[in-house]
C-alpha cells in the first residue's frame, strides 16, 4: 500500500480569486541557482502548504494498492489531514541508502525507507519494460561560498533518493489520471507526442555514423535499446542529449493524447500544485467531483498558456545558468582544458568540459590548417585535409579564448585531437 499525500493548495487558492488569477498568470514557479520565484506567495508555499514536521496539514491523498510485482490492485483518492512524523532531506536519505546508517533516523523510518527503496525499483523496472524512456543526464550544480560567491560548477546526477520520490510521484500522477478519465473530470493533461518522422530519421543517421545499429525508434523500448548500446561509453551522455533533442515537447492540453516518453496513456500532473498551475486545476476538479458540483470546462487556451509559461521558465533557467557559467569562466581565460565533442553545426563544434562543468563553442576556423564539411543530412563533420570524421564524445584539447557576454557563450580554440 502506497500513500502519496499532496498539500491541498486548492483549499486556500479559490477559483477566480486575485490569488488564483496571479497563479494562472505565472503558471509555474521558476527555479534559478540560489533562488526561487514562486508561483504562490511564500505564506502558502513555505508555510500553510508546506508539509512541516509535527504539524497538521490539509492534503489530498492518492492511496494505491499493488502486488509484489508492481501491478495495481486498487486505487482511491480523497481529501485528508496528515501530520508529518519526520521531514527528511534527499541528502540524508541518500547517505542511508549508500551506507545503511543514519543516526538521525529512528528504526521505523529506516525500515520504511528500505521497503520503499525496493518497491521503487520494482515500479521503475516495470515502467521501463513498458517503454518509458530512462534518461540519466547531469545538470550543473553551482557551489557558493558563505559570502554568496560562486566557487565551482559541478556535474550533478539524480540520486537514488530522488529517483524513489520520482517513481512514487509518477505512479500517483498516472493513477489520478485514470481516475479522472473514468469520472470524466475536466483537467489539463500532460501530453507528449511521439517524435516527428524527420527527427527520427536524422537521429537514425547519426547513430549509423557512430557505427551503431539503430532500432526502428517506434516505441520507447526502442530508445531504451539504443541507450543500452552505448551504456558506459564516452559517447553515452551525448547520445542521450541527441535522443532528447529528437523528442517532441511535452505540453498541457484539455484533450488526452498520451505520453510517449513515459509510455503512459493516462498522465497528468497532480503532485505539485504549489509550483504548477495545471496541478491546482486537477485538485479543483477532484473537489468539485466530491462535492457533486458541476466542474468548469477547461478551454484549449488554458493548456497553451500553461505550456507557454513553462517554456518561458525553462528559457529563464537555462539562460541564467549560461550567464553564471560565463561569468565564472572569466578566471579561466587562456587556460587549456580536456573536453569532449557534444554537438555540431555549420559553423563549428560544441565542446563540453567536465570540471568546471560548462559547454562552449569552437568555430571551425579555430582549427589551423584544416577545412571542415558539415553534412546536416547525416549530421556528421568531416575534416577534409586529414580525412577524419568527428564523432560525438570524441576527446579534444581546447583553450578558452573568448567570453561572449552578450550571448552568454564560451569560445574555445583548438589545441589537439586527443584520442
Where do the PLM segments sit?
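Conserved, carboxylate-rich catalytic/transport cores that coordinate ions
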Residues: 1-419
Amino acid at each position: 500500500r502506497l500513500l502519496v499525500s499532496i498539500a491541498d493548495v486548492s483549499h486556500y487558492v479559490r477559483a477566480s480569486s486575485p490569488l488564483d488569477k496571479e497563479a494562472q498568470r505565472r503558471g509555474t514557479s521558476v527555479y534559478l541557482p540560489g533562488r526561487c520565484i514562486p508561483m504562490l506567495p511564500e505564506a502558502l508555499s513555505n508555510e500553510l502548504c508546506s508539509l512541516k514536521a509535527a504539524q497538521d496539514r490539509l492534503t489530498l491523498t492518492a492511496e494505491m494498492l499493488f502486488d509484489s510485482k508492481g501491478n495495481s490492485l486498487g486505487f482511491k483518492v480523497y481529501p485528508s489531514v496528515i501530520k508529518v512524523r519526520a521531514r527528511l532531506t534527499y541528502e540524508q536519505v541518500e547517505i542511508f541508502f549508500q551506507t545503511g546508517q543514519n543516526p538521525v533516523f529512528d528504526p521505523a523510518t529506516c525500515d520504511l525507507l528500505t521497503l520503499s527503496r525496493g518497491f521503487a525499483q520494482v515500479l521503475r523496472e516495470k515502467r521501463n519494460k513498458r517503454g518509458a524512456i530512462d534518461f540519466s543526464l547531469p545538470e550543473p550544480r553551482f557551489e557558493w561560498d558563505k559570502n554568496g560567491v560562486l566557487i565551482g560548477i559541478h556535474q550533478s546526477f539524480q540520486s537514488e533518493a530522488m529517483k524513489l520520490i520520482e517513481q512514487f510521484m509518477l505512479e500517483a500522477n498516472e493513477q489520478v489520471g485514470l481516475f479522472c478519465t473514468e469520472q470524466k473530470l475536466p483537467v489539463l493533461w500532460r501530453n507528449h507526442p511521439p517524435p516527428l518522422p524527420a527527427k527520427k530519421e536524422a537521429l537514425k543517421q547519426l547513430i549509423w555514423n557512430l557505427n551503431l545499429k539503430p532500432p526502428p525508434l517506434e516505441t520507447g523500448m526502442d530508445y531504451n535499446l539504443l541507450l543500452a548500446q552505448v551504456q558506459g561509453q564516452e559517447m553515452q551522455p551525448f547520445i542521450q542529449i541527441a535522443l532528447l533533442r529528437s523528442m517532441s515537447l511535452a505540453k498541457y492540453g484539455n484533450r488526452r493524447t498520451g505520453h510517449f516518453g513515459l509510455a503512459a496513456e493516462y498522465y497528468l500532473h497532480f503532485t505539485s500544485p504549489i509550483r504548477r498551475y495545471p496541478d491546482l486545476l486537477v485538485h479543483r476538479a477532484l473537489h468539485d467531483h466530491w462535492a457533486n458540483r458541476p466542474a468548469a470546462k477547461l478551454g484549449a487556451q488554458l493548456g497553451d498558456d500553461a505550456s507557454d509559461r513553462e517554456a518561458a521558465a525553462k528559457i529563464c533557467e537555462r539562460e541564467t545558468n549560461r550567464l553564471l557559467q560565463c561569468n565564472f569562466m572569466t578566471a579561466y581565460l587562456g587556460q587549456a582544458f580536456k573536453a569532449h565533442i557534444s554537438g555540431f553545426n555549420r559553423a563549428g563544434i560544441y565542446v563540453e568540459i567536465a570540471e568546471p562543468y560548462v559547454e562552449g563553442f569552437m568555430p571551425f576556423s579555430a582549427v589551423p590548417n584544416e577545412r571542415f564539411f558539415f553534412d546536416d543530412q547525416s549530421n556528421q563533420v568531416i575534416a577534409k585535409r586529414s580525412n577524419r570524421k568527428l564523432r560525438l564524445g570524441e576527446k579534444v584539447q581546447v583553450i578558452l579564448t573568448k567570453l561572449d557576454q552578450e550571448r552568454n557563450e564560451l569560445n574555445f580554440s583548438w589545441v589537439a585531437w586527443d584520442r
